[in-house]
C-alpha cells in the first residue's frame, strides 16, 4: 500500500508510471493466494542402454533459471534497449526512459527488483499484470505494452512513453475549463472501462493518477497506465477483497461483495471531481470517507453545482447509484446525451474555483507520506526488532501487508476483545494511503512510541532542511520530492501553500509538526491498542 509506484510506503508517482504494480503488496483475490500441493510420484530408475554406435553430441536445451519469475530463460534488455534518464523511483525499483536500439523510438521501462517480490502472491501478481497488459495492448486509451525482459536481478516492463504528464496537471495548467472538456476526458476514461469489461477485465483501481496524456500536444490522447490491481473477470464469482483508493471505492467493495460495476462508480467519482474540483465523499480520515460512501448522499447544492447542467448531474447520479444492479453500464454512459460527441455538454467555462480546489486536492498528503517514509527508513534494526516480529506474526499470508482479517485475528491472539467497528477504526488510523491494507512502513510509524516518533519528526524535518536554516524552502522541497519521483513544480507550490500557515513561502518546523500531528492523532489509537 501507499508505495512509490506500488501500494506500499507512499504514493510517489514518477511521471505516472509505477516501478511495481499496485497489487504486489495489497489484498489480492483469494484464488491467487494458495494452491494445493500434490505429492509427485517417485521417478522410476531408467534401464541402462549399451551404446553401440558413435557417441552423439547431446542436444542443448535452454531451461529457465531456477529463480525465474516468468518461467523462461533470462534475456538482457540491453540487447534491444538503452536505458536513459530516471523518471521515477520507488521501493520496488525504478522507471526509466529507454530507447529502442533498432528504431531510436522512446519508451518507458519499469524495472522491478526481484528480491523485493518476496511471496508467491507477489510473483503471481506481476505475472497477472503482464498478462492483462498484453491482453489489452493496442486498444484505445490504454498504454501500449511493448515487451517484458527478465534477468537475474530484475523484471523489466517496456511500454509506451506517455510524455504529456498527469490529467489534473494539464487541466490546471490550461487555466480554463468547460463541461465539454470534462465530457471529452470522461468519455476516454469510460472507454477504458468499456474495453476492459468487453475483454473480460475488471480494473478495480480507477483514479486520475492512473491516467497519463500520450504527449504534450493539445489534443493528446488519455491513456490508462496502471493495471496492478486488475483481474480477469470470472463469471458468477463474487469478489470480496477490499482494494482500490479511498475516495474512489464503490460501496459494494466496502460491503465485500462486488463485480465489474465498481469501475463505473470510480469513473463517476472522477467525473464529479472534474465538474466540481472535489470528491463527492469527503472526510478527515478514511473511516469518514467510507461512512460517507455507504451513506451515499451526493452534494449537488454547493458551488459550482447550481451552474452545472442538469444533464451532467443526471449522468453523475446514474454512475453513482448505490445499487450496482441499477447502476448505468459503460455502454449506457457512452450513449448518454451529455457524454456523446457533439452532445449536450456546454462549452461555457466552469467556475475557476473548481481548478483551485482541484489543485489543493491533488497536493494533499504528498509531503506527509514522504515524511513518514523518511522516518521509517531512519530507524535502526534494534529499535524496530519487536515491531518487525509483530508485523510478521500478523501478516499470516506473508504478502507484505496486513489486511482487516489479519489485523482482527492478530489482535485476538494478543488477547484483545475489540469489536469489529473498533478494529476497523484501528485499520483506518494506520492506513495512511487508504488502500485498505497496512504495509510495513505504515505499521512501524503507527506503532512506534509517540515520543520516539516525535523525535524522528525533527530528523525528518532536517532531511528536507538541507542548509539547516530552520525552514524548508521551495528548492529544498523540490530536491527531496524529485529524488523520489514525487512531484513537479506545480505540486510543490501547492504543498507549500497548504502547509505554510503564515504565508511566508517556506515551511517552518512548527508548520511541519502541525501537518504530521494531524496524521499522528489518527494513529495514536492504533499504537495504544497494540502495545497496551
From Swiss-Prot:
Pfam families xref list: EF-hand_7, Pkinase
Location(s) in or outside the cell: Membrane
EC number: 2.7.11.1
Metal-binding as UniProt keyword: yes
Region of interest (Disordered), residue spans: 1-71
Positions of Ca(2+) 1 binding: 395, 397, 399, 401, 406
Protein keywords: ATP-binding, Calcium, Kinase, Lipoprotein, Membrane, Metal-binding, Myristate, Nucleotide-binding, Phosphoprotein, Repeat, Serine/threonine-protein kinase, Transferase
Domain of life the protein comes from: Eukaryota
GO molecular function terms attached to this record: ATP binding; calcium ion binding; protein serine kinase activity; protein serine/threonine kinase activity
Chain positions covered by the region annotation Autoinhibitory domain: 345-375
Binding-site residues for ATP, renumbered to this chain: 87-95, 110
Annotated Ca(2+) 4 binding sites: 500, 502, 504, 506, 511
Span of domain EF-hand: 382-417, 418-453, 459-486, 487-522
Membrane topology listed for this record: Lipid-anchor
One cellular component term from this protein's GO annotations in UniProt: membrane
Lipid sites, type N-myristoyl glycine: 2
Record-listed Ca(2+) 3 binding positions: 465, 467, 469, 476
UniProt-annotated binding residues for Ca(2+) 2: 431, 433, 435, 437, 442
Similarity remark: Belongs to the protein kinase superfamily. Ser/Thr protein kinase family. CDPK subfamily.
Entry remark concerning the domains of this protein: There are 3 contiguous domains conserved in the CDPK subfamily: a kinase domain, an autoinhibitory (junction) domain and a calmodulin-like domain. The autoinhibitory domain (345-375) inactivates kinase activity under calcium-free conditions.
Record-given protein name: Calcium-dependent protein kinase
